A protein has these predicted regions:
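FAD-site-proximal beta/loop scaffold in flavoenzymes
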Residues: 126-153, 236-304
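Helix-biased detector of long, well-ordered alpha-helical tracts
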Residues: 388-742
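A conserved FAD-binding loop/helix module that cradles the flavin
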Residues: 287-337
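C-terminal auxiliary extensions adjacent to catalytic cores
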Residues: 7, 339-392
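Beta1-alpha1 glycine-rich phosphate/pyrophosphate-binding loop at the start
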Residues: 2-79, 158-159, 167-198
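A Rossmann-like FAD-binding core segment of flavoenzymes
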Residues: 80-88, 103, 175-271
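FAD-binding beta-loop-beta segment adjacent to the flavin cofactor pocket
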Residues: 265-282, 326, 342-348, 441-443
Length: 742
């Protein structure tokens, strides 16, 4: 999944809009060998905008109306970068991201939607709630709805914008809230739904009246203060909550790009959806405007532009003539009415009824299903790299015979680019490191300390190289923390695939920067490393630490009567395995990543504070495998409470579908040490005891009289899944080391 194939060209997609989801699915079904897709989006889900009113009304759940971008990108072998774009450098073919390294591209496409634009209204920020970006609006709406549902006080809500969006949203709010709250719709036009048939306008004016929604027309908003709308006609309107559903503009980050934009900041494109400024930049949806005609912002255009965009991206890579996009002059518009009623309009015709809503519902759900119900079996296998990509460098990389030994080292040019400007935090006890490199690093070890050394490395388990670098650093440092050591230095081990130099250097740099961000926080200095070419990426670290001789936390220090505490939930193995098969929900993957990004440093400090002297980190051998390591040199047995073991969201579901990590079957052989395993071996929770963990939590023995204090302290310090999972007792049978209790 995480690009084992050769990367020659990078297609970068900004935004998970309706056009881009079509492109991503198409490349999953029919990839171009050598082209790597990367989607950058601030959220792991993409709302199908036509279903937004249905969410507000309560007709749809979150999952009903959203496309899972993690499943889609996993299906299509597309990298997913959860991030915020803050700029584009077209001259350097780079996209600048907030809080992480930039990404380079050979072809860039932008389908990230528009922003609300109310520059002419004073004091609007932090008071009014714009509908765009939609995810921010939905979280605000959820908060307000919850407030209203738990209060008897009538609330005064104002919506500004008399177009289809404003009308749909205010009628949906009425349906959701009932009649006890005051709703007002304000438009600067002399009528609502400008451009729609008279009959459609009549239907909705009548509907607003019947549902006690005030309609204020021909009002220009001058200023919005807290609780008051001030108009140019010196007529004020009071409100508790105000929503903006009208004017839009391009995002702020696009304005500093030196690309051709219109007055509202939208990207200007030609009829091939290509930027007027740069031929390797495309755009679609609400973020674009055409240079030769006006096209109103509507989801139907973005959906249909997706097909042309997909064809033109493919043709651009093959240096072929691009297709022209020809928007339809008229299209069917369906506007919902809050309840399960809707109005359909085309030309001068209008139709109203429940059947219209159910028709729209069928269309919308069908669209969502195309991108959420995916099967990897549908994908074509095409390994042949297009001739146009076969530069001298690429041809050389594809030679049958590649050297071993030192002839397989990464080129100096790759290393120089990757190691430039890494911002490594320095320690006083590092004598020679990367700032003054030599044949080896030199490190001071104080007379009263011992040196601890550990090593770990593995292939990527997620597609984002920066996140992968962070997780790998946490995982490698965890062994030191489990011993009670203070990390000191790290040396990188990196096997790099056969890609062009500039692709490799950026990939390596992203991984290193992710790791260094963690190392700097953990007071660990990167002092060197080694790179070699390989079939796929492998990455990790040899880490060293310092420890007092009398403060070593050994696995075998468990005592009779100790309570067993686990600091993190288990389940990363099965969730990551499901993600590789496009079977994991985005929220599950997000939670698993958040868990892996939590350092074990503070948890070990807390464990020591409350008398813990035995601990280990839970990694590849799973909870049972690592617990057995703690027990094997003792005369003790562990009583495990299966119901108390914390489990990551979704892990029970994925493992019950027999989606397991590669090491799972071998780990399950540890069952022979469990006294009563046959009572539980069909339970998904039992299977998770053997799930291999990446950057897992700490398992420790704590004296019984300090358990509650220890758990409270762990919870206060961000270890919210910390639980007591069992007790250690005296062993009666040599073969049995674990007993599971209900």
């Amino acid at each position: 999944m995480f690009y084992k194939k050769q990367v020659i060209k990078d297609l970068l997609l900004i935004g998970g809009g309706h056009s881009h989801i079509k492109v991503i699915k198409s490349f999953g079904m029919n990839p171009i060998p050598g082209v790597r897709l990367t989607l950058i989006n601030p959220d792991m889900y993409s709302l199908y905008s036509g279903m937004l009113p249905g969410i507000i009304s309560g007709h749809y759940s979150f999952d009903d109306a959203h496309i899972d971008l993690i499943k889609l990108t996993s299906y299509s072998n597309c990298r997913f970068i959860k991030g915020k774009v803050i700029g584009i450098q077209p001259g350097d073919n780079r996209v600048i991201l907030e809080g992480r390294p930039p990404l380079s591209y050979d072809l860039l496409s932008i389908n990230s939607g528009s922003s609300s634009n109310y520059k002419e209204i004073e004091d609007i920020d932090n008071i009014a709630i714009p509908v765009k970006p939609i995810n921010n609006f939905l979280s605000q709406w959820k908060y307000i709805k919850n407030k209203i549902d738990n209060s008897k006080k009538e609330r005064n809500i104002v919506v500004i914008g008399g177009g289809a969006g404003g009308v749909e949203i205010i009628t949906a709010m009425r349906h959701s809230l009932g009649e006890k709250n005051s709703l007002t719709l304000i438009t600067k036009e002399n009528k609502i739904l400008s451009g729609f048939p008279k009959k459609t306008i009549h239907y909705f004016e009548d509907h607003l009246k019947k549902n006690k929604i005030k309609l204020i027309k021909e009002i220009e908003i001058k200023k919005i203060t807290k609780g008051k709308v001030i108009s140019t006609k010196e007529k004020d309107f009071l409100f508790d909550d105000i929503f903006l559903v009208a004017q839009t503009a391009g995002p702020q980050w696009l304005k500093g790009s030196n690309l051709s934009l219109n007055d509202e900041g939208f990207l200007l494109v030609n009829d091939k959806l290509q930027s007027l400024s740069k031929e390797n930049i495309f755009g679609s949806g609400d973020i674009i405007d055409f240079d030769n005609y006006n096209l109103k912002k509507a989801g139907v255009y973005a959906v249909r532009q997706g097909d042309v965009l997909n064809k033109n991206i493919r043709k651009y890579f093959q240096n072929k003539i691009l297709h022209k996009y020809k928007p339809q002059k008229n299209f069917l518009s369906i506007i919902t009415m809050g309840s399960k009623n809707a109005v359909a309009s085309k030309y001068s015709l209008s139709f109203k009824g429940k059947w219209v809503w159910y028709w729209k519902n069928y269309i919308d759900k069908n669209f969502i299903a195309k991108f959420n119900n995916l099967s990897i079996k549908d994908m074509k296998i095409n390994e042949r790299i297009p001739k146009i990509f076969l530069t001298k460098e690429v041809k050389k990389l594809n030679e049958d015979i590649r050297c071993g030994g030192c002839g397989a080292k990464a080129a100096r040019e790759i290393l120089n680019l990757a190691l430039d400007d890494l911002n490594i935090k320095k320690r006083d006890d590092i004598v020679i490191g990367l700032d003054n490199p030599d044949d080896a690093s030199i490190i001071k070890i104080p007379n009263d300390k011992l040196s601890t050394i550990s090593l770990d490395f593995f292939p990527p388990m997620i597609s984002d190289p920066y996140l992968f670098g962070q997780i790998t650093a946490h995982h490698c440092l965890s062994d030191l923390y489990a011993m009670g050591a203070e990390p000191q230095s790290a040396m990188a081990i990196s096997c790099l695939p056969l890609w062009p130099k500039h692709k490799l250097s950026e990939e390596l740099k992203s991984m290193l920067l992710g790791s260094i961000q963690v190392f700097n926080n953990e007071n660990t200095q990167l002092v060197g490393g080694h790179t070699s070419e390989a079939e796929q990426c492998i990455y990790g670290f040899s880490v060293t630490g310092l420890i007092n001789k009398d403060k070593i936390l050994s696995k075998s220090n468990l005592k009779k009567g100790d309570a067993l505490i686990l600091t993190k939930a288990i389940g990363t193995g099965t969730i990551l395995a499901a993600n590789m098969r496009a079977k994991a929900n985005a929220s599950w993957v997000d939670n698993a990543i958040e868990s892996m990004l939590v350092s074990n440093r503070m948890s070990v400090d807390i464990i020591k504070k409350y008398g813990g002297i035995a601990c280990t980190d839970i990694t590849g051998f799973g909870l049972i495998g690592h617990l057995l390591e703690m027990l094997e040199r003792t005369q003790l047995i562990a009583n495990l409470n299966l119901e108390n073991i914390p489990i990551l969201d979704g892990a029970d579901e994925t493992i019950s579908k027999k989606i397991i990590s590669t090491l799972q079957d071998n780990n399950e052989k540890f069952s022979r040490y469990i006294k009563n395993y046959s009572e539980f071996n069909k339970s998904p929770n039992y299977k998770l005891l053997f799930d291999p963990q990446t950057a897992g939590g700490i398992l420790a023995g704590i004296p019984e009289d300090h358990v509650d204090e220890c758990l409270n302290d762990l919870t206060k310090n961000n270890y919210t899944n910390a639980r007591r999972i069992g007790t250690v007792e005296e062993q009666t049978n040599k073969e049995e080391k674990i007993y599971i209790i209900k």
